Regions:
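Conserved AdoMet/S-adenosylmethionine-binding subsite of the radical SAM
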Residues: 64-68, 72-75, 80, 84-167
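Flexible, glycine- and charge-enriched loops at secondary-structure boundaries
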Residues: 49-56, 149-153
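Generic, well-ordered alpha-helical segments
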Residues: 25, 51, 55, 82-85, ...
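N-terminal [4Fe-4S]-dependent radical SAM core
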Residues: 1-30, 35-52, 65-72
């Protein structure tokens, strides 16, 4: 690994996932999430510390070995934690996947989304490499959302509107 290689904090891999997108998928669970959902399936991913540090290239090389299981409908899903907290890493990982014609899916709460122009530029780059976007909206009602997650949902709803407007 070079000093300039982009790295990410990876909690774990599920090499034969059947619920995080269509077909058989290799699911990468990233470390770090600001929400504290009462019914979280992965609370061990909340801390930004922990997991293993990977370069996007090394991680892709590892998961690409499972491609024969994916068939024409499967591929890679990045989840978390909150993958948008490591957007540059996910973008590089998906860029490597697209070079090999691998289907990509992003499973996110959208909690870190904002309408800042520099953020949107980075987000749009990621979207260009994402085949399936899974937005996990916990609750539309702001007070219920805060009660369930400990966070407001303004950024999440802004993301839903942004996706609807920008297809």
């Amino acid at each position: 690994m070079t000093d300039t290689a982009l790295t990410g904090q990876v909690h774990s891999l599920e090499t034969f996932g059947l619920v995080d997108g269509p077909g058989v998928r290799c699911v990468v669970f990233l470390q770090g999430c600001k929400m504290r959902c009462r019914y979280c399936h992965n609370p061990e991913t909340w801390s930004q510390q922990g997991g293993e540090t990977w370069t996007a290239e090394d991680l892709f090389r590892k998961v690409y070995r499972y491609r024969n299981y994916w068939g024409k409908d499967g591929g890679l899903t990045v989840s978390g934690g909150e993958p948008l907290l490591q957007m540059e890493f996910v973008t590089e990982f998906f860029n490597l996947a697209k070079k090999k014609q691998v289907n990509t899916a992003l499973d996110t709460s959208g909690n870190s989304f904002c309408l800042d122009p520099s953020y949107l530029e980075r987000f749009d780059r990621l979207m260009d490499l994402t085949d399936l976007f899974l937005l996990d909206i916990k609750a539309v009602d702001a007070s219920l959302h805060k009660q369930l997650t400990g966070q407001d949902n303004a950024g999440i709803l802004a993301l839903a509107h942004y996706l609807a407007d920008h297809g």
